Amino acid sequence: MKQETPITLHVKSVIEDDGNQEVIEFRTTGFYYVKQNKVYLSYYEEHDLGKVKTIVKVSEGEVLVMRSGAVKMNQRFVTGASTIAKYKMSFGELELKTSTKSIQSDLDEEKGRISIAYDMHVGDEQEHLHNMTITYEGGTHA
C-alpha cells in the first residue's frame, strides 16, 4: 500500500506565442507518493469544463501528466523527444504534439519542484513555447 503525504501545490504555466505571453497559475492541495521507485503527485484542478483529476508521474528524464474527468489526456514529456497526445473533451478532441526541450526536477516528501520547457503544436496551429513549473510543500493540508 502506498503512503500518501498531503501537499500544497502551485502550478504555473507560461505560454509564449509571437511575442505575447500568457500566464496560467493556480494553487491546490493534493498528495505526494512513491510507487515502484517513481514519484507521483496527485491533485484536482478546476477547469472551464469542470473538475479534472491530475496525476503527475516523474521518472528519470520523463514526466507523464495524466488527466481525467472533464478533460482526458495523457501527456508525456521526454527530454529531447517529440510525443503526441489526444486532449479529449465532451465535445471533441484535439491532437497535441509536444517537443520537450528540458525537464528539471528536485523532489522529496517535504517539498519539490518540477520544471518542463516544451514546444507545443495544437492540431495544425502554430507552435507555442510552454514553461510549466509545479512546486509543492508537504504536510500543509488542514
From Swiss-Prot:
Membrane-spanning residues: none
Matches recorded under Pfam families: DUF1934 (PF09148)
InterPro entries xref list: Calycin, DUF1934
Oligomeric form and interacting partners: Homodimer.
Domain notes: Forms a beta-barrel structure that may accommodate hydrophobic ligands.
Protein name: Uncharacterized beta-barrel protein YwiB
Taxon lineage: Bacteria, Bacillati, Bacillota, Bacilli, Bacillales
